[in-house]
Design a protein with these regions (language model features):
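A short alpha/beta connector and helix-capping loop motif
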Residues: 42-63, 71-76, 81
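Short acidic, Gly/Ser-rich segments with clustered Asp/Glu that frequently serve as metal-coordination loops
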Residues: 21-23, 33-45
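Acidic, polar low-complexity linker/tail segments
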Residues: 8-32, 50, 59
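Long, charged alpha-helical interface segments
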Residues: 2-3, 90-117, 121-127, 141, ...
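Solvent-exposed alpha-helices and their adjacent loops that cap or buttress functional pockets
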Residues: 5-10, 24-28, 68-70, 99-103, ...
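Structural motif
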Residues: 13-15, 31-34, 54-57, 74-77, ...
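Extended, compositionally biased flexible segments
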Residues: 66-70, 74-91, 95-98
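Phosphate/ribose-phosphate-bearing ligand recognition and processing surfaces
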Residues: 155-165
Length: 194
């Protein structure tokens, strides 16, 4: 990628949260949140879209997921709790399940232990993007195009950070740094070193 002319370089602040539980939702307006749950929600969502899902609808609670799916009719109901497929759901949270044959042309309603909670908690942000190792360069480019300060919001596990999410946050932050001038918080700096 050719360098961006200096007069076009945007300065973006990047802040990383190790767990969505710690995310201050009253400070999201004007920010682009990149929600990261590498193992597995984010990877499932990205892989589902790659394989032709018409849309992905993240839902925090199971009752709402079932209700939305039943109203929609022909859709795929996906989800897990504690890494276990939910009885009555079509698929769980393994990207290998999000094949073109399974999700192509269909809406996917997904509810997971951590990932969809992180996405839903971000709804007051100006923009919400899904980040994983599968799309770190593309999501970084889109975040820079949007021009807002960025929050890398790791889903974590049980309210604590997960190394896989921090690793992906570092890959995304590093990709953003190749595109623009960026101010990094300490956790973002550390994630870039992982």
């Amino acid at each position: 990628m050719p360098p961006i002319p200096e007069e076009n370089i945007l300065s973006i602040n990047i802040k990383t949260y190790g767990s969505f539980v710690k995310l201050p939702i009253n400070h999201l307006a004007g920010h682009t949140v990149i929600s990261i749950d590498v193992l597995r929600s984010s990877s499932c969502i990205v892989w589902g879209l790659v394989n032709g899902a018409s849309k992905i609808i993240p839902v925090d609670d199971l009752g709402s997921a079932v209700s939305i799916a039943s109203r929609m009719g022909d859709c795929v109901l996906a989800g897990e709790r504690g890494a276990v497929l939910i009885p009555g759901f079509d698929i769980g949270n393994s990207p290998a399940e999000y094949t073109e044959a399974r999700v192509g042309g269909k809406a996917v309603v997904i509810s997971t232990t951590n990932g969809t909670g992180a996405i839903c908690k971000s709804e007051s942000a100006s923009n919400v993007l899904i980040g994983s190792m599968l799309n770190c360069t593309a999501v970084a480019k889109r975040a820079v195009e949007l021009g807002n300060d960025v929050i890398l919001m790791c889903a974590g596990t049980g309210g604590e950070f997960s190394a896989d999410d921090i690793y992906a946050a570092g890959a995304i932050a590093s990709a953003i740094q190749t595109l623009t001038d960026a101010e990094l918080c300490d956790l973002t700096r550390v994630s870039c070193l992982v």
